[in-house]
Every structure is written in structure tokens, then in C-alpha cells.
């Protein structure tokens, strides 16, 4: 999972993720937006599910983050899309709507994001 942190002209931190992990970058850009308390909540949740079969979920405005002791899933909160509505020859692109990664990799990303924001 490759990622890059940038600042836009307003100073807002932007996360760019490798292909297949775009939704995770969108989650940081849309749901975190530099609010480190969101990351603290996620880290506390990760500790709370460790060694159990419990799951934790945070529903945001655009994306929902779910985690268990092994994996993190970020999914867009969009309404389900019916492919029957598409014109012939058209397809629906949803690769940026769902991303999965290991919990340890995600927590490393959270740590690196926090460091970038604070420096």
C-alpha cells in the first residue's frame, strides 16, 4: 500500500493512495481533514477489538470505516447502484468506493499522517 501526503494551496493535507486503496485516501481527505481526534478514536477502537471477534464502525458523511482485529475496510456511503439503469455498452466504475487493508498497515498510515500534519 503506497501513499503520499501533500498540502494544497490552503494548507489542507491531501492523501493520495495507490490503486486499490483510493477509498482510504478519500476517507482521510473527506472524514479526517486534519482532525487528529478522529484518528485517536480509530486507534482506541483498534485497541478495543484486539484479541476479540468484535468489530468497530465509524459512519462519516461520505465514507464508513469498519475494522476488526485484522483488517480495515473503507466504503463509500453511496446508495446502491443498479446496473439495469445503465445504457447498453456502459459500465459502472466503483473501484474507488471500497478499499481493504491490514490493520497494522492502516495504523502505520495513521501514525505517518499525524506526523505529517503536526510538522
Curated annotation (Swiss-Prot):
One Pfam family this sequence matches: UPF0231
Q: Which family does it belong to?
A: Belongs to the UPF0231 family.
Name of the featured protein: UPF0231 protein PC1_3552
Q: Mind giving the lineage of the organism this protein is from? A: Bacteria, Pseudomonadati, Pseudomonadota, Gammaproteobacteria, Enterobacterales
Amino acid at each position: 500500500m503506497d501513499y503520499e501526503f501533500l498540502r494544497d494551496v490552503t494548507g489542507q493535507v491531501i492523501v493520495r493512495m495507490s490503486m486499490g486503496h483510493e477509498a482510504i485516501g478519500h476517507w482521510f481527505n473527506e472524514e479526517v481533514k486534519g482532525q487528529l481526534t478522529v484518528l485517536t478514536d480509530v486507534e482506541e477502537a483498534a485497541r478495543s477489538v484486539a484479541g476479540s471477534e468484535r468489530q468497530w464502525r465509524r459512519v462519516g458523511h461520505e465514507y464508513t470505516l469498519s475494522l476488526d482485529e485484522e483488517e480495515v475496510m473503507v466504503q463509500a456511503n453511496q446508495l446502491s447502484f443498479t446496473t439495469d439503469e445503465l445504457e447498453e455498452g456502459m459500465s459502472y466504475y466503483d473501484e474507488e468506493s471500497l478499499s481493504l487493508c491490514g490493520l497494522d498497515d492502516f495504523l502505520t498510515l495513521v501514525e505517518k499522517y499525524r506526523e505529517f500534519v503536526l510538522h
